[in-house]
Amino acid sequence: MAGGKKKTATKTQKKKNQSQIKVTEEIYALIAICVSLIVMFSLYTDKAGYLSVISRTLLIGLFGIGAFFIPIYIIYLCTKLFLFKREVLFSRIGLGITIALITSVLLIQTVNINDYYVQGSIWGSIKTIWHSQSEWHGGVVGFLIVLPLYKLVGKIGLFVIFVTLYLISSMLIFDYNLVSIRNFFGGFKEKASKVKFVDKKYEKDDYINLKKKDGASEGNKESKKDDISEDNNKIKILDFMKNSSLNDIEDNKKEKDNQLKDNIKINDFKQESKMPRDLSLDNTIIEQRGFNSEKAKEEESIDKEISNNIASKGSSVGASYVAPNADLLNLNNNNELDKDDKKALLANAAKLEETLMSFGVEAKILQVTKGPSVTRFELQPKAGIKVSKIVNLADDIALGLAAKGVRIEAPIPGKSAIGIEVPNKEQTPVFFREIVESKEFLDNKFKVACALGKDITGKAVVTDLSKMPHVLIAGATGSGKSVCINTLIVSILYKYSPDEVKLLMIDPKVVELNVYNGIPHLLIPVVTDPKKAAAALNWAVNEMTRRYKLFADNGVRNIESYNALYNKGEVPEKLPYIVIIVDELADLMMACPHDVEDYICRLAQMARAAGMHLVIATQRPSVDVITGVIKANIPSRISFAVSSQIDSRTILDSAGAEKLLGRGDMLFYPVGESKPQRVQGAFISEEEVEHVVSFIKESQRDAQYEEDILEHINSATIASEGNGDGDRDELLDEAIEIVVESGQASASYLQRRLRIGFNRAARIIEELEECGVISRRDGSKPRQVLLSKDELENMK
């Protein structure tokens, strides 16, 4: 105990001594600052009495013009060393300023050395300096430093030394190196060669050049701002409104004329066209569509040729089917980027770099791509910076850019860059006609092509449903889910005849898909009753089984091989692809969850090779609707805006969908991809759908529905309503007799009487309740038997 008390007392005594030392140091520092202020006052004025005369004579005699800076330095050192407890006396900038001041004092002494130097007498020179009435010299100390060097290297050698010292001080103050000086003065040729290489590399893309701002007069700005403005001249700006084959020739012509003029590149797209034109546009003028101009007439004629081209392609696939033309769809008259938009993008790029720099993240923006709904900034972080550090700054970046929210794609697949997606102030719609007229839609040879929209670069996104092979679509109300389903259906109507693709539509909401009733692609009218929907899925399972039996009998493995036999005349029947579209899965799961889940899982597991594909949509992506079994068997996903990150993880197995903007903004996650792709869904209005459907109905024969399917659905529905759906337990009749005779009903009672497990007994109790034999459960009260013995005898 005594030893512990001694140790405590020793520690306390040490702390007291340290505090006393600190107080003493601070007192000395305050005294030194006070003396320095008095000396500085006496140097700068002549109102300090004898002290002014003494200090001026002593300090100016020793240090010359440098004496005026000595009190300031003493105050600086005392404040930093004793009051703020800084161990490092001089920072990089402070050291540079000190070197510059000392060099200036020595330079003044060198310039005036002949006025104070007495030949052959150093002491006489010192006396001359001491009694000089001028302050423009280096004092005795400066003279003793300069004189040996003057004798050694001469005045020219001293000037070389001073220039070197000034260069060192400027490097410390402004934080640059000799390599940056070389790049600034001699690196223009290297930059021009790099620009030429980038232009050649991207010659196939549709870039046009902006004129570079003349920034030569801004060379004396702060180095940080100079770096940002220099980087802006290297940023490639891509606009989704200029990615069109309609403007391929003029864009390529402009690109060749301006290859080395600018470092900023832009990619827009307008109406895509398959008819090339040789039009010359002025580099600074963007011509818009006008109804009274010759250009408008020419574009209208081209649009008609496009429509005829689409119709001819559609009519070639089916002898009796005439595909609708593009004139039934609305045109997109949105304009390209103007100069103000480009300036705003560059300003946001600079602001993004500054925001990241403020958090210690040094990164360089390589490219800015403006999409329909978001603008993506592609940045490359400096080596050694973790990607997770940038990802964690999402909210801070949104605050710095005054954005609703940002989505960070780290890294961008196929690029050594990180994508920061910032919402546009105004969302630009993508019209369905743009996708229909794109070469991605016209020239593909997909088995079941489905148009989705455009990605962030303006490229049309068209997928092959036969490769997916099933897709799950989820999104909150109003996010664009129903429009996406309409684009999928209408793209099939534009591309394929009824002999090639058949549709089976299930619409529990009744009003979404009823417009398609009467088209020849439908197997049966749109199913709206949930119980009939389960029966329709049951028919699909039976059809899948029948097709596999046909494949086995003919020695083939899939629908392509079987139809190849039909083309050779070896089999009598051609099998069309069947696309099963379910518009609201949640309602079906509430009505008959077990049947729907079982049928969907069987189709998802086996229907691909049979040419049957599922498109399932829901506005409630919760785990009780999209079960684990359904998710495991449907690999491709499309997610629109959802309300929470939990819903996003349910549909995509990752976060991100909660940050979508709605109105068609989607994440497309096809099978085989490592990350989802952001797509702006194509918009098709109800009027456009009605025009397309009316055209098909008028130009084709009346729809001939499959009567066998309708009979199967009706019979299955009746059997289900009559409890003859195959799920009835074989012990149910015996259980009814036991319950009626005993007058009591419980799972444990049936378990003992029938000698079965508890789970099976509980299911039998549920069936008895559905049949009306026993009452519903009422808390802890026993169930009542509602069927009497006489009624049971009459039923027999």
Swiss-Prot record:
Entry keyword Hydrolase: no
SMART domains: AAA, Ftsk_gamma
GO MF term set: ATP binding; ATP hydrolysis activity; DNA binding
Signal sequence range: none
Location of this chain's protein in the cell: Cell membrane
Membrane topology: Multi-pass membrane protein
Keyword Amino-acid biosynthesis appears in the UniProt entry: no
GO cellular component, one term: plasma membrane
Sites where the protein binds ATP: G478, S479, G480, K481, S482, V483
Pfam families: FtsK_4TM (PF13491), FtsK_alpha (PF17854), FtsK_gamma (PF09397), FtsK_SpoIIIE (PF01580)
Keywords: ATP-binding, Cell cycle, Cell division, Cell membrane, Chromosome partition, DNA-binding, Membrane, Nucleotide-binding, Transmembrane, Transmembrane helix
All residue ranges annotated as the FtsK domain in the record: 458-649
Cytoplasmic side: 177-796
GO biological process, one term: chromosome segregation
Family stated for the protein in its record: Belongs to the FtsK/SpoIIIE/SftA family.
PANTHER family in the record: DNA TRANSLOCASE FTSK, SPORULATION PROTEIN RELATED
Subunit relationships: Homohexamer. Forms a ring that surrounds DNA.
UniProt remark on domains: Consists of an N-terminal domain, which is sufficient for the localization to the septal ring and is required for cell division, followed by a linker domain, and a C-terminal domain, which forms the translocation motor involved in chromosome segregation. The C-terminal domain can be further subdivided into alpha, beta and gamma subdomains. The alpha and beta subdomains form the DNA pump, and the gamma subdomain is a regulatory subdomain.
Task performed by this protein: Essential cell division protein that coordinates cell division and chromosome segregation. The N-terminus is involved in assembly of the cell-division machinery. The C-terminus functions as a DNA motor that moves dsDNA in an ATP-dependent manner towards the dif recombination site, which is located within the replication terminus region. Required for activation of the Xer recombinase, allowing activation of chromosome unlinking by recombination.
Protein name from the UniProt record: DNA translocase FtsK
